[in-house]
């Protein structure tokens, strides 16, 4: 017996089955922006150390960028506008070259000074109450074009407003 002949009509769809169990919640991949303020001294070896609190989860694949508050200016309405620069940043001083630099792990950020002269000769304006903005970009969010030199572009990309930036003063 052989099955030959024209193909028959398409059958009807079956009944929908019962919904399966819900899957586990996924990880909420969110970026974070933190401002830290600290002072470089001989006692802290001219470095500022910030350990991420347990409320901030940073993965090894995430990107951590640090910006330095370089200056403050005014807009046409007389409102203050912060000028941020992506680190590292180098200043040319009478004593020589001074570089503000950083490194990070998924546990912490270390911001430090490097120079070709004795750092104890620095003026307080170069060391005291310096403000840095740390931006944590999840690896999943860094695909495509993003101007990381512009903190406003980074914050917009992460969906973070100025009011949502956590402020931390280090001792």
Residues of each region from the PLM?
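Extracellular or exported targeting regions of proteins
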Residues: 30-131, 135-171
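Collagen/collagen-like triple-helix recognition
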Residues: 2-32
């Amino acid at each position: 017996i052989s099955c030959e002949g024209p193909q028959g009509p398409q059958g009807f769809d079956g009944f929908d089955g019962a919904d399966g169990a819900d899957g586990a919640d996924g990880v909420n991949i969110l970026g974070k922006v933190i401002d830290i303020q600290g002072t470089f001294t001989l006692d802290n070896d001219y470095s500022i150390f910030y350990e991420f609190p347990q409320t901030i989860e940073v993965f090894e694949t995430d990107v951590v960028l640090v910006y330095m508050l370089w200056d403050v200016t005014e807009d046409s309405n007389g409102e203050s506008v912060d000028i941020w620069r992506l680190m590292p940043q180098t200043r040319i001083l009478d004593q020589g070259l001074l570089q503000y630099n950083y490194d990070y792990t998924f546990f912490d950020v270390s911001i430090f000074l490097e120079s070709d002269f004795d750092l104890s000769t620095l003026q307080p304006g170069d060391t005291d109450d310096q403000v840095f903005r740390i931006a944590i970009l999840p690896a999943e969010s860094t695909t495509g074009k993003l101007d990381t030199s512009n903190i406003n572009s980074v914050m917009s990309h992460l969906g973070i407003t100025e009011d949502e930036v956590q402020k931390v003063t280090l001792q």
